[in-house]
Protein backbone atom coordinates (compact mmCIF):
# COMPACT_ATOMS: atom_id res chain seq x y z
CA UNK A 1 0.00 0.00 0.00
CA UNK A 2 2.78 2.40 0.96
CA UNK A 3 4.56 1.67 -2.31
CA UNK A 4 1.46 2.67 -4.29
CA UNK A 5 1.17 5.92 -2.34
CA UNK A 6 4.87 6.68 -2.88
CA UNK A 7 4.47 5.80 -6.57
CA UNK A 8 1.63 8.32 -6.91
CA UNK A 9 3.45 11.01 -4.91
CA UNK A 10 6.59 10.49 -6.97
CA UNK A 11 4.61 10.92 -10.18
CA UNK A 12 2.93 14.11 -8.93
CA UNK A 13 6.16 15.68 -7.74
CA UNK A 14 7.87 14.58 -10.95
CA UNK A 15 5.24 16.50 -12.89
CA UNK A 16 5.93 19.57 -10.73
CA UNK A 17 9.67 19.09 -11.32
CA UNK A 18 9.02 19.28 -15.06
CA UNK A 19 7.22 22.60 -14.55
CA UNK A 20 10.24 23.94 -12.64
CA UNK A 21 12.70 22.67 -15.25
CA UNK A 22 10.80 24.46 -18.01
CA UNK A 23 9.90 27.69 -16.21
CA UNK A 24 12.75 28.56 -13.82
CA UNK A 25 15.31 29.29 -16.58
CA UNK A 26 12.70 31.57 -18.18
CA UNK A 27 12.02 33.36 -14.86
CA UNK A 28 8.38 32.26 -14.99
CA UNK A 29 6.25 31.41 -11.96
CA UNK A 30 6.17 27.72 -11.12
CA UNK A 31 2.92 28.14 -9.17
CA UNK A 32 0.70 30.35 -11.30
CA UNK A 33 -0.63 29.32 -14.68
CA UNK A 34 -1.64 25.96 -16.09
CA UNK A 35 0.67 23.74 -18.08
CA UNK A 36 0.69 24.28 -21.83
CA UNK A 37 2.20 22.76 -24.95
CA UNK A 38 5.54 24.49 -25.70
CA UNK A 39 4.80 24.20 -29.44
CA UNK A 40 1.20 25.38 -29.92
CA UNK A 41 0.88 27.06 -26.48
CA UNK A 42 -2.54 25.45 -25.94
CA UNK A 43 -3.33 24.78 -22.28
CA UNK A 44 -3.20 21.11 -21.39
CA UNK A 45 -6.41 19.56 -20.06
CA UNK A 46 -6.25 17.64 -16.78
CA UNK A 47 -6.81 14.28 -18.48
CA UNK A 48 -3.78 14.92 -20.69
CA UNK A 49 -1.66 15.95 -17.72
CA UNK A 50 -1.65 12.74 -15.69
CA UNK A 51 2.02 12.10 -14.83
CA UNK A 52 3.68 9.38 -16.95
CA UNK A 53 0.35 7.83 -18.00
CA UNK A 54 -0.73 10.67 -20.29
CA UNK A 55 2.59 10.58 -22.14
CA UNK A 56 2.06 6.90 -22.91
CA UNK A 57 -1.62 7.27 -23.86
CA UNK A 58 -0.85 10.21 -26.16
CA UNK A 59 2.10 8.27 -27.62
CA UNK A 60 4.39 11.18 -26.83
CA UNK A 61 2.49 13.74 -28.91
CA UNK A 62 0.40 16.83 -28.14
CA UNK A 63 -3.32 16.14 -28.60
CA UNK A 64 -3.80 19.52 -30.30
CA UNK A 65 -0.83 20.12 -32.63
CA UNK A 66 0.47 16.52 -32.82
CA UNK A 67 4.04 17.71 -32.24
CA UNK A 68 6.28 15.38 -30.26
CA UNK A 69 6.50 15.90 -26.52
CA UNK A 70 10.06 16.00 -25.22
CA UNK A 71 10.98 12.59 -23.79
CA UNK A 72 12.49 14.47 -20.86
CA UNK A 73 9.01 14.85 -19.34
CA UNK A 74 8.55 11.10 -19.05
CA UNK A 75 12.13 10.52 -17.87
CA UNK A 76 11.80 13.11 -15.09
CA UNK A 77 8.53 11.65 -13.85
CA UNK A 78 9.91 8.10 -13.90
CA UNK A 79 13.05 9.21 -12.06
CA UNK A 80 10.92 10.90 -9.43
CA UNK A 81 8.79 7.77 -9.00
CA UNK A 82 11.90 5.61 -8.71
CA UNK A 83 13.46 8.00 -6.17
CA UNK A 84 10.39 8.03 -3.94
CA UNK A 85 9.99 4.25 -3.98
CA UNK A 86 13.72 3.56 -3.51
CA UNK A 87 14.11 6.00 -0.60
CA UNK A 88 11.12 4.48 1.19
CA UNK A 89 12.44 0.97 0.53
CA UNK A 90 15.85 1.69 2.08
CA UNK A 91 14.95 4.19 4.81
CA UNK A 92 11.31 3.45 5.65
CA UNK A 93 8.82 6.02 6.94
CA UNK A 94 11.28 8.27 8.75
CA UNK A 95 12.26 11.93 8.91
CA UNK A 96 15.43 10.93 7.08
CA UNK A 97 13.30 9.61 4.21
CA UNK A 98 11.25 12.80 4.12
CA UNK A 99 14.39 14.93 3.86
CA UNK A 100 15.89 12.71 1.17
CA UNK A 101 12.64 12.93 -0.82
CA UNK A 102 12.91 16.72 -0.75
CA UNK A 103 16.55 16.52 -1.80
CA UNK A 104 15.74 14.12 -4.65
CA UNK A 105 13.26 16.56 -6.22
CA UNK A 106 15.75 19.42 -5.98
CA UNK A 107 18.43 17.21 -7.52
CA UNK A 108 16.23 16.15 -10.43
CA UNK A 109 15.32 19.77 -11.22
CA UNK A 110 18.94 20.96 -10.97
CA UNK A 111 20.21 18.02 -13.03
CA UNK A 112 18.04 18.75 -16.06
CA UNK A 113 18.23 22.56 -15.89
CA UNK A 114 22.03 22.50 -15.80
CA UNK A 115 22.18 19.80 -18.47
CA UNK A 116 20.06 21.89 -20.82
CA UNK A 117 20.83 25.50 -19.92
CA UNK A 118 24.25 25.34 -18.19
CA UNK A 119 22.89 27.19 -15.15
CA UNK A 120 21.96 26.27 -11.59
CA UNK A 121 19.41 28.82 -10.31
CA UNK A 122 19.86 30.40 -6.89
CA UNK A 123 16.17 29.65 -6.30
CA UNK A 124 17.25 26.01 -5.94
CA UNK A 125 20.67 26.13 -4.26
CA UNK A 126 19.87 28.68 -1.54
CA UNK A 127 16.83 26.78 -0.18
CA UNK A 128 18.91 23.58 -0.26
CA UNK A 129 21.62 25.24 1.85
CA UNK A 130 19.08 26.53 4.36
CA UNK A 131 17.26 23.20 4.70
CA UNK A 132 20.55 21.33 4.95
CA UNK A 133 21.82 23.51 7.78
CA UNK A 134 18.55 23.75 9.74
CA UNK A 135 18.03 19.98 9.75
CA UNK A 136 21.51 19.49 11.25
CA UNK A 137 20.19 20.76 14.61
CA UNK A 138 17.91 17.70 14.95
CA UNK A 139 19.79 15.14 17.09
CA UNK A 140 17.38 12.35 16.14
CA UNK A 141 18.33 12.17 12.47
CA UNK A 142 20.35 9.34 10.93
CA UNK A 143 23.88 10.40 11.93
CA UNK A 144 25.44 7.94 9.48
CA UNK A 145 24.18 10.16 6.67
CA UNK A 146 23.54 13.56 8.24
CA UNK A 147 26.11 15.51 10.32
CA UNK A 148 25.56 17.72 13.35
CA UNK A 149 25.38 21.48 12.89
CA UNK A 150 29.13 22.02 13.37
CA UNK A 151 30.15 19.57 10.65
CA UNK A 152 27.28 20.84 8.51
CA UNK A 153 28.55 24.42 8.71
CA UNK A 154 32.13 23.34 8.02
CA UNK A 155 30.88 21.24 5.10
CA UNK A 156 28.98 24.13 3.55
CA UNK A 157 31.94 26.49 3.75
CA UNK A 158 34.42 23.83 2.63
CA UNK A 159 32.24 22.74 -0.29
CA UNK A 160 31.88 26.29 -1.57
CA UNK A 161 35.52 27.28 -1.11
CA UNK A 162 37.01 24.22 -2.78
CA UNK A 163 34.97 24.73 -5.97
CA UNK A 164 35.50 28.49 -5.82
CA UNK A 165 39.27 27.93 -5.63
CA UNK A 166 39.14 25.62 -8.66
CA UNK A 167 37.21 28.29 -10.58
CA UNK A 168 39.66 31.00 -9.48
CA UNK A 169 42.87 29.16 -10.39
CA UNK A 170 41.44 27.82 -13.66
CA UNK A 171 40.61 31.37 -14.72
CA UNK A 172 44.09 32.55 -13.72
CA UNK A 173 45.79 29.80 -15.73
CA UNK A 174 43.47 29.59 -18.76
CA UNK A 175 42.20 33.19 -18.70
CA UNK A 176 38.59 32.04 -19.15
CA UNK A 177 35.71 30.69 -17.12
CA UNK A 178 35.64 26.99 -16.27
CA UNK A 179 33.05 25.91 -13.74
CA UNK A 180 30.40 28.37 -12.63
CA UNK A 181 29.52 29.65 -9.17
CA UNK A 182 26.32 27.61 -9.42
CA UNK A 183 28.52 24.51 -9.05
CA UNK A 184 30.15 26.05 -5.96
CA UNK A 185 26.75 26.76 -4.41
CA UNK A 186 25.57 23.23 -5.21
CA UNK A 187 28.65 21.78 -3.54
CA UNK A 188 28.06 24.07 -0.56
CA UNK A 189 24.51 22.73 -0.30
CA UNK A 190 25.85 19.17 -0.34
CA UNK A 191 28.31 20.13 2.39
CA UNK A 192 25.49 21.53 4.53
CA UNK A 193 23.47 18.35 4.01
CA UNK A 194 26.17 15.71 4.46
CA UNK A 195 29.13 17.41 6.13
CA UNK A 196 32.68 18.10 5.07
CA UNK A 197 33.62 14.41 4.81
CA UNK A 198 31.29 14.06 1.82
CA UNK A 199 33.04 16.72 -0.25
CA UNK A 200 36.27 14.90 -1.29
CA UNK A 201 34.32 11.78 -2.27
CA UNK A 202 31.70 13.74 -4.23
CA UNK A 203 34.38 15.71 -6.09
CA UNK A 204 36.36 12.56 -6.89
CA UNK A 205 33.36 10.55 -8.10
CA UNK A 206 31.82 13.43 -10.05
CA UNK A 207 35.14 13.96 -11.85
CA UNK A 208 35.46 10.25 -12.67
CA UNK A 209 31.87 10.05 -13.96
CA UNK A 210 32.39 13.22 -16.01
CA UNK A 211 35.50 11.74 -17.62
CA UNK A 212 33.67 8.50 -18.41
CA UNK A 213 31.00 10.44 -20.31
CA UNK A 214 33.21 13.11 -21.88
CA UNK A 215 36.27 11.14 -23.07
CA UNK A 216 34.39 9.07 -25.72
CA UNK A 217 32.95 12.26 -27.25
CA UNK A 218 36.45 13.75 -27.38
CA UNK A 219 37.83 10.63 -29.05
CA UNK A 220 35.17 10.59 -31.78
CA UNK A 221 35.53 14.38 -32.07
CA UNK A 222 31.83 15.07 -31.45
CA UNK A 223 32.96 17.42 -28.68
CA UNK A 224 35.90 19.84 -28.60
CA UNK A 225 38.21 19.85 -25.59
CA UNK A 226 37.31 23.51 -25.04
CA UNK A 227 33.55 22.80 -25.08
CA UNK A 228 31.52 23.86 -22.06
CA UNK A 229 30.43 20.97 -19.83
CA UNK A 230 27.58 21.19 -17.29
CA UNK A 231 29.22 19.83 -14.14
CA UNK A 232 26.15 20.00 -11.89
CA UNK A 233 24.72 16.65 -13.07
CA UNK A 234 28.02 14.92 -12.29
CA UNK A 235 28.14 16.50 -8.82
CA UNK A 236 24.65 15.15 -8.20
CA UNK A 237 25.64 11.65 -9.35
CA UNK A 238 28.67 11.82 -7.04
CA UNK A 239 26.42 12.83 -4.13
CA UNK A 240 23.98 9.99 -4.83
CA UNK A 241 26.89 7.53 -4.78
CA UNK A 242 28.02 9.01 -1.46
CA UNK A 243 24.58 8.58 0.12
CA UNK A 244 24.28 5.06 -1.29
CA UNK A 245 27.61 3.95 0.17
CA UNK A 246 27.96 6.31 3.16
CA UNK A 247 28.26 3.43 5.65
CA UNK A 248 31.05 1.75 3.70
CA UNK A 249 32.87 5.05 3.12
CA UNK A 250 32.84 6.06 6.80
CA UNK A 251 33.84 2.57 7.95
CA UNK A 252 36.76 2.66 5.52
CA UNK A 253 37.91 6.15 6.57
CA UNK A 254 37.22 6.02 10.28
Protein language model regions, located:
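Transmembrane helix-loop-helix
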Residues: 87-99
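C-terminal ends of transmembrane helices
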Residues: 18-23, 59-67, 107-119, 164-176, ...
